Amino acid sequence: MRRILSIDGGGIRGVFPASFLAALESDLDAPLGQYFDLISGTSTGGIIAIGLAMGMSAKDILELYETEGAGIFYQDSNGVTAWAGKKFRAARWLAWGAKYPTERLRTALEGILGEKRIGDARTRLMIPSWHRQTKTVYVYKTAHHERLQTDYRDLAVDAALATAAAPTFFKEHITANDVGLVDGGLWANNPVGYAVAEAVGVLKWPADELKVLSVSCLQDIGKTKSSYSARTMVTKTADFFMAGQSHGSLGLAHILTGDPHERKAIWRICQPAPDGDFTLDDTSRIRDLKDRGFVEARQQKPILAPHFFTEPAEAFVPVHKLEGDDRA
C-alpha cells in the first residue's frame, strides 16, 4: 500500500491544514511526513509539504505560521502605523503589481530550511509552480525516477518561494538558477490529481494500492448570484477558476484510483466556511484557523488512523543523490 498526502494552496489559510496535521501527528511515534510515500503541495501547501518532507514536525510548521504569519503579510503593527502600512501596500500593488515584499517570507523560510536542497528530502516530493516566460508548468520533484536529474540539486527555499509567489500578493521569484517562477496555484492549487498521476504514471505504483489524504485550506460557501458588479466579478472569476481546477484535479484522482465506485481510496478534508470570512492574507484569523484545524482532526483521527498511520512508510532512497547522501 502506498500513501499520498496532498495539500492545497490558500495563503495564511494554510494554518488550517498545518493545525489539522499537527493534531493528527500528536499521537504518532514519528514526524507525520514519515508516514507518506509521496507528498505534494501548492503555494502555502507547498511550504507545508516541503517542511514535512525535510523531516520537520507538523507542530513546528504550525508554529512558523503563528510566529511569522503577521510579519510576512506586514500586519504586525497597529494604530496609525497599521493604517499607513495598508495605504502603502495599496500603492505598492498599483505600482509594482505585488502587495507585499518577499523579504520577510524568504527570511522565515531560510530560518527553517537553511541551505537544504530538494535532494535532502526524506519523502518523495512534488511542488507545482508556473514558468511565466514560456507559460508552462514547472514542477519541483525529488529524484524518485531516473529521468529526474536536475531538481534534487536545487535549494528547498527556491521551491518554497516559487510555489508561494502568488500574483498580486508577491512578485515573481527568481531562483538561484535565474529562473523566474510564480505560484503553482495558477494551474494546480489543488495538486491531488497530479500527485496521483505521478504515482501511477511515473512511479508505476498500482492504482488499486493507493490511499490518498487530500487537505484543503477551507472551502468558501456562499450564494451564487446570476450577475455581479464588474468589481466583484474580478474576484469571483478567480474563485470560480480555483474551484473548477480543484474539482477537476480531484476528479482525475477519483478516476485513476477507482474511488468511490470500485473502492475507497481518497479522503478529502474540505471544511466549509462562510464566503469571505477567511481571506488569503488576514492574519487576524490565525487563531480561528488553528481552532478549526484541531476540531477537524479530532473528528477525522479515528477514521484516518487505520489507513494512514499504523506504521511509517518505507524509507525513500532517491535515484540521484547529493554528495554525502548514504541512503541505500
Model-derived features: where do they sit?
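C-terminal helical/tail subdomains of lipid-metabolizing enzymes
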Residues: 171-178, 186-188, 207-210, 217-219, ...
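Short helix-terminating capping/connector loops at secondary-structure junctions
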Residues: 31-35, 118-122, 204-209, 260-263
